[in-house]
From Swiss-Prot:
Protein keywords: Activator, Nucleus, Transcription, Transcription regulation
Subcellular location: Nucleus
Domain notes: The QLQ domain and WRC domain may be involved in protein-protein interaction and DNA-binding, respectively.
Protein encoded by which gene: GRF9
Main location (coarse class): nucleus
Annotated Gene Ontology cellular component terms: nucleus
Protein's recorded name: Growth-regulating factor 9
Native source species: Oryza sativa subsp. japonica
GO BP terms, alphabetized: developmental process; DNA-templated transcription; regulation of DNA-templated transcription
Domain of life (superkingdom): Eukaryota
PANTHER family per the UniProt record, alphabetical: GROWTH-REGULATING FACTOR 5, GROWTH-REGULATING FACTOR 9
Domain WRC: 151-195
Length: 426
């Protein structure tokens, strides 16, 4: 019977790593043998209650002898010693602690044997270390950045809402955020200067053509002041030259076309404006003894048939016409206070030209309407019309066959736009 017991003790020693355990002889004390056998049986029962894959398959753990030896001086036969032994050997570790301990023991075996450690064993340790670092709010010292914030997903955009949401896009190179969120918190400066220069370049070609609502607003008035069309200056110079040539030229042509010359010379056109510019005085041009006088027969006859019903006062509330006329006068550098209007006197059939341009609500007057610049350009710059010798007055003088047509149709002449009357205003 004792031989069977010694054989069982040797088997327990082989399982638990007690290879150095020798079976004592019968002459030795039986108490020490019983204690060792009891300790081996209890450790085997504890290992059976918590199985481990490493212990069963590879049998790598061989430290059960030092871990579960009984304290010295304890008697195994009493009940309190049995309870103490069960409490110490039943649950020494939790299952997770036991597996981690076996894992570390396996790595130690590789180190002791001077063999390369598999990467699968090391990856599990790094994962456990990261989870413990995030849980304990430790800094990731293993990355080499002691003060860097822990980022579980490096390379991902770090834009968050502060709670749960995080951007799913990848961060740019050497940046924390993606292309969408990299400039989110930057204060935007003013618009670049290039855009402003492009706007001015786009606006400058528009200044050559006057809109229909010229004079409404300071910006549009500034455009009118800056605009200096070459056609108007050319016509003024040519008309002044023709006036000088007319005084020295043929008197026979003047006698034949006397009423026509009076009409063309004394229109409120650029020649009258040039005379006002030389005198620098607002004057009233009456027809008493002046050679530049105009009679109502020569001035108003062409329009009496067509504008007899419309020869009434223009409403004072038409600020549009006033602004248009003021913008046209500024191009001829007239003073601001100089105004001009055409008034038909009741006593004498004389057309006076006072120094005011604006119509008053009291007296029936004929106002000068602002020109349409697009129409003026079409009249002055046409492909089929060539500049005659002597200017527009020379054209009228040479075209002496049909003087009635030129009188009855003032709009056909290049300066007909300056005498647009009530039919254009309405």
């Amino acid at each position: 019977m004792f031989a069977d017991f010694s054989a069982a003790a040797m088997e327990l020693g082989e399982v638990l790593g007690l290879q150095g355990l020798t079976v004592p002889s019968t002459k030795e004390g039986d108490l020490s043998l019983i204690k060792r056998a009891a300790a081996g049986s209890f450790t085997q029962a504890a290992a059976a209650s918590y199985p481990s894959p490493f212990l069963d398959e590879q049998k790598m753990l061989r430290f059960a002898k030092a871990a579960h030896t009984l304290p010295s001086g304890l008697d195994f036969g009493r009940e309190n010693e049995q309870r103490f032994l069960l409490s110490r050997t039943k649950r020494p570790f939790t299952p997770s602690q036991w597996m981690e301990l076996e894992h570390q023991a396996l790595i130690y075996k590789y180190l002791n044997a001077k063999a390369p450690i598999p990467s699968s064993l090391l990856i599990s340790i790094s994962k456990s270390f990261r989870s413990s670092a995030n849980r304990m709010s430790w800094r990731p010292l293993y990355q080499g950045f002691p003060n860097a914030d822990s980022d579980p997903e490096p390379g991902r955009c770090r834009r968050t809402d502060g709670k749960k949401w995080r951007c799913s896009k990848e961060a740019m190179a050497d940046h924390k955020y993606c292309e969408r969120h990299i400039n989110r918190n930057r204060h935007r400066s003013r618009k670049p200067v290039e855009n402003q220069s492009r706007k001015t370049v786009k606006e400058t070609p528009c200044a050559g053509s006057l809109p229909s609502s010229v004079g409404q607003g300071s910006f549009k008035k500034a455009k009118v002041n800056e605009m200096k069309p070459r056609s108007i200056s050319y016509w003024t110079d040519s008309l002044n030259r023709t006036m000088a040539n007319k005084e020295k030229g043929n008197k026979a042509a003047e006698e034949n076309n006397g009423p026509l010359l009076n009409l063309t010379n004394q229109q409120p056109t650029l020649s009258l404006f040039s005379q006002l510019k030389q005198q620098n005085k607002p004057e009233k041009f009456n027809t008493a003894g002046d050679s530049e006088s105009i009679s109502s027969n020569t001035m108003l006859k062409p329009w009496e048939s067509s504008n007899q019903q419309n020869n009434k006062s223009i409403p004072f509330t038409k600020m549009h016409d006033r602004g248009c006329l003021q913008s046209v006068l500024q191009n001829f550098s007239l003073p601001k206070d100089e105004k001009m209007e055409f008034q038909k006197s009741k006593d004498s059939n004389v057309m006076t030209v006072p120094s005011t341009f604006y119509s008053s609500p009291e007296d029936p007057r004929v106002s000068c309407h602002a020109p349409n610049m697009a129409q003026m350009q079409e009249d002055s710059i046409s492909s089929s019309w060539e500049m005659p010798q002597g200017g527009p007055l020379g054209e009228i003088l040479t075209n002496s066959k049909n003087p009635d047509d030129s009188i009855m149709k003032p709009e056909a002449r290049p300066y007909g736009w300056l005498l647009n009357l009530e039919d254009h205003a309405m």
